[in-house]
From Swiss-Prot:
Pathway: Amino-acid degradation; L-tryptophan degradation via kynurenine pathway; L-kynurenine from L-tryptophan: step 1/2. This is Tryptophan 2,3-dioxygenase. Substrate binds at residues 34-38, 100, 233. Homotetramer. Heme binds at residue 219. It comes from Herpetosiphon aurantiacus (strain ATCC 23779 / DSM 785 / 114-95). GO terms for molecular function: heme binding; metal ion binding; tryptophan 2,3-dioxygenase activity. Keywords: Dioxygenase, Heme, Iron, Metal-binding, Oxidoreductase, Tryptophan catabolism. It is an enzyme of class 1 (oxidoreductase). It catalyses: L-tryptophan + O2 = N-formyl-L-kynurenine. The gene is kynA. Heme-dependent dioxygenase that catalyzes the oxidative cleavage of the L-tryptophan (L-Trp) pyrrole ring and converts L-tryptophan to N-formyl-L-kynurenine. Catalyzes the oxidative cleavage of the indole moiety.
Amino acid sequence: MSQALTYASYLKIDELLNLQTPRSHGPEHDELLFIVIHQVYELWFKQILHELDYLCDLLRANDTGRANQSIRRILTILKTIVAQVDVMETMTPLQFNAFRGSLESASGFQSLQFREIEFVLGYKRPAILQHFAALPSHERLEQRYQEPSLWDSFLHYLQLNGYAIPSEQIGRDVTQSLVASPAIQTILITVYRQNPLVSNLCERLIDLDEGFQEWRYRHVKMVERTIGMKQGTGGSSGAAYLASTIKPFFPDLWAIRADL
């Protein structure tokens, strides 16, 4: 007879609490915090991807109400992961450097799930695929690269709501990063002036974009505070590389602000 389901067995608490394996000698007290925070990030990234996939489906089904609800959930998660930076910043540079060497070449740059999030949001770079080419998870990332982005689903949503989206946008090469489109901007200006329901969804997408930029900014400042302008453990330029990634995912929604 099988045992009754418990809190611990349902959530696999024993397995979960055995996943933190410090590598430093001692180990250093602060390494556990570093591991826990990054593992929690990965769990939130998993949930964000789950929500983004759902959001794409909702947009393609023209379900505005549930789409807004899904975006609100993602925004709340983003606020949570931004707040985790506050916890990380309780660690001083000396405390981090006490175990930094134990990380060897491991780096947040190697987070496959965050690269998946970037791809879903339309920020696609072939070099990222090459970086993960030797890993078993490369196939999953390649699939994300080949799939339409959230913005493509949004354009489909606009089409369902009666807006004539140019064929070159609907049929665009989805492996390319998004670039601003004057034609789409003209449509969006009309949306804002005439359709409160759809323009409200546009504003929630702006919130989403801003939320990711806020997290990137806090991440940059945390890295600067901890290691200054040193090279990252994975070989990147550290804070300088992170700062270069603070750019909007949905440029058309930002470009129309001056014309509203």
